[in-house]
A protein has these predicted regions:
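Histidine/acidic-residue-rich, glycine-tolerant segments that coordinate divalent metal ions
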Residues: 31, 59-60, 81-83, 87-99, ...
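Metal-dependent amide/peptide-bond hydrolase catalytic core
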Residues: 212-388
Length: 388
């Protein structure tokens, strides 16, 4: 069957929900207004078991099927970004300096649409746990939810999530078994020398020269220390030194990001960074300090769950519109914390022509909501059928 007819029937309502959320973006863990809207909407559907205050402003709602069985977890992120919207849409952000530039308003709407349908029909066994999670963008709300025991508390067996993708055909799903998204780490290097007058460099220990050497040497981690079969990104994204033209600064700061798909490569990167930083410190007689921060782990899909998700996606969009062996993405996602604890799958959904994610002109395509909601609904019915 294609898009669920009942879900298509309330497409106009989903559009209203999405635009309401879009107009009222919130940041990080402080998504209380968004959570209140979600809770009120769920209660309109007749869903009474709603647990709030998870990861501060997150919530989990439970829908019981017609028969006993397992609990499937469906997750949507609800937070926005600290950006100023430039779309000039009539439903543009009302909150200065905040906007839904990554489509979390759409993700939330898709899960609400599935919730409405599932609460009406309940043609499945077991239970559905609807997970509305704050702080995907920065503070790791997924990690906090796991630490607070959300998976054990609701006895969730499998977990699934969707992310929208602009400029991919509307309704096209793609995913893959194994690591689909990279782990994301940060590094900070402080090069400390001796400052002084720019006219007397011999009386200083210039931190800029060794910093330049460090930046160049970091690039060799990818080109000379990495197995060519392993994907790896080491990007220097910030260099800060000095404040005027006739003073040699005391400090130079280097910041950047590392993207990896497995721990062996990650450990190699850390070891090589430590060696490079120590070597330049000794060569130039300066003090170099490396601070490496491990961030979101890789997002690793379970093959069996990918197969199940692909069945549901093909049921909604057709076989030709589903790629279940897509390539890896170098972006990162805190749904990875849930996948470390439970088998599941993360999928991408094309939303058609649109500005890129994290762009001030981005807007989620409302036409995609019926695809995502139908996917979640059919996933529940296919994976937890009645009479199993």
């Amino acid at each position: 069957m294609p898009i669920v007819n009942r879900i298509a029937a309330f497409d106009a309502d989903m559009k209203k929900w999405r635009r309401n959320i879009h107009q009222n973006p919130e940041l990080g863990l402080d998504c209380y207004q968004t959570a209140s809207f979600i809770e009120a909407t769920l209660r309109e559907f007749g869903i009474s078991e709603i647990h709030t205050g998870i990861a501060q402003s997150g919530l989990v709602a439970i829908i019981d099927g017609k028969e006993n069985g397992d609990t499937i977890g469906l997750r949507a992120d609800i937070d926005a970004l600290p950006m100023t919207e430039t779309t000039n849409l009539e439903y543009a952000s009302n909150n200065s300096g905040l906007m839904h530039a990554c489509g979390h308003d759409g993700h939330t709407t898709m899960l609400l649409g599935a919730a409405r349908y599932l609460s009406e029909t309940r043609n499945f066994s077991g239970r559905v746990a609807l997970i509305f999670q704050p702080a995907e963008e920065n503070e790791g709300g997924g990690r906090i939810m796991v630490e607070e025991g959300v998976l054990d508390r609701f006895n969730i067996k499998n977990v699934y999530a969707i992310h929208n993708t602009p400029d991919v055909t509307l309704g096209k799903f793609y995913t893959m078994p194994g690591a689909i998204m990279a782990g994301a780490d940060k590094f900070h290097i402080d090069v400390v020398g001796v400052g002084g007058h720019g006219a007397y460099p011999h009386e200083t220990k210039d931190p800029i020269i060794p910093a330049i050497g460090i930046v160049h040497s970091l690039q060799t981690i990818v080109s000379r220390s990495r197995d060519p079969n392993d994907k790896l990104v080491v990007s220097v994204t910030q260099i800060h030194a000095g404040s005027t033209d006739n003073v040699t600064p005391e400090n130079t700061y280097i910041n950047g990001t590392v993207r990896t798909f497995d721990k062996v490569v990650q450990d190699m990167v850390i070891k090589r960074m430590e060696e490079i930083v120590a070597g330049h410190a000794q060569s130039f007689g300066v003090d170099c300090k490396l601070r490496y921060e491990k961030g979101y782990p890789p997002t690793i899909n379970n093959p069996e769950n990918v197969e199940m998700a692909a069945l549901a996606a093909k049921d909604v969009s057709g076989v030709s519109m589903v790629d279940d062996n897509a390539g890896q993405e170098m972006g990162a996602e805190d749904f990875s914390y849930l996948l470390e604890k439970r088998p599941g799958a993360y999928l991408f959904l094309g939303i058609g022509e649109a500005a890129g994610l994290h762009n001030t002109n981005y807007d989620f395509n409302d036409d995609a909501s019926v695809y995502g909601a139908s996917f979640f609904a059919r996933l529940v019915e296919i994976s937890q059928p009645l009479g199993r």
